[in-house]
Amino acid sequence: MEEQGTGIRVEAMAAEYAQQARVWAERLGLPLQDDTAAFAVQVGADGLQIQQLGPQAPGPVRVDFVEGQAAHRRQFGGGNGQMIAKAVGIAQGIRPQVLDATAGLGKDAFVLASLGCQMTLIERQPLIAALLEDGLARARADEEVGPIVGRMRLLTGNAIERMRAWEGEAPQVIYLDPMFPHRDKSALVKKEMRVFRPLVGDDLDAPALLEAALALASHRVVVKRPRKAPIIDGPKPSHSLEGKSSRYDIYPKKALKA
């Protein structure tokens, strides 16, 4: 038996998805065959998902804006009273244009889009960006969620470089949630982190990310951190909003107006 490596393969969950699997393999530059792979990008009835391989592997990770956690948060998440809404400056008559420069699986961006914000998302890791692209495409077909994801535009690549080379109108608010080595024990976060960490690693460039965001945003920068984590090296935030497990550090530049 071959030892498991660190590679990634693409596989179809059934014969009818073989062509889609070939397309994704070509786009991502990944093989369709690799018996030693540590991860599989799987193509099936539920779209695209990433499955860690091996006996102790958690379940697959995919993006689903229509059902599950996203649907529950959309319906019961607290609307404009949510801390993230206050952090980015949502108020009566104010729905800022927001750039989420560390999009991940798009959960926070989806919450803000569901509250009416026009969102631009940047994701640097090609596999995570592929999950996000697939989730957005499936959500567009849903009658209720389609208009929400219609407010979400996905860009791929290095967020620092993209912000430094930004052309056109600057985003009013830039939202950052750098990958941070924290110990959240919830099953879902644990599963996603176990899959993410080997693929993405920690954002050791967080100070440069903050610097680029502060240079570009017209009104404010918001940084989400684990509640007890230190602030990112660089300018100090003016204030923070603190929740049970996380907090939002606010770096204002000028007031948002209705």
From Swiss-Prot:
Catalyses which reaction(s): guanosine(1516) in 16S rRNA + S-adenosyl-L-methionine = N(2)-methylguanosine(1516) in 16S rRNA + S-adenosyl-L-homocysteine + H(+)
Gene3D superfamilies, per the entry: Vaccinia Virus protein VP39 (3.40.50.150)
Basic and acidic residues composition bias: residue spans: 239-252
Coiled coil: none
Region of interest (Disordered), ranges: 232-258
Compartment(s): Cytoplasm
Binding sites annotated in the UniProt record for S-adenosyl-L-methionine: E123, R124, D177
Keyword Ion transport set for record: no
EC number per UniProt: 2.1.1.242
Gene Ontology MF: a single term: rRNA (guanine-N2-)-methyltransferase activity
Pfam families: SAM_MT (PF04445)
Annotated keywords: Cytoplasm, Methyltransferase, rRNA processing, S-adenosyl-L-methionine, Transferase
Recorded GO CC terms: cytoplasm
Task performed by this protein: Specifically methylates the guanosine in position 1516 of 16S rRNA.
Stated family: Belongs to the methyltransferase superfamily. RsmJ family.
Matching PANTHER family: RIBOSOMAL RNA SMALL SUBUNIT METHYLTRANSFERASE J
HAMAP family the record matches: 16SrRNA_methyltr_J (MF_01523)
Name the UniProt record assigns to this protein: Ribosomal RNA small subunit methyltransferase J
Taxonomic lineage: Bacteria, Pseudomonadati, Pseudomonadota, Gammaproteobacteria, Pseudomonadales
This protein's encoding gene: rsmJ
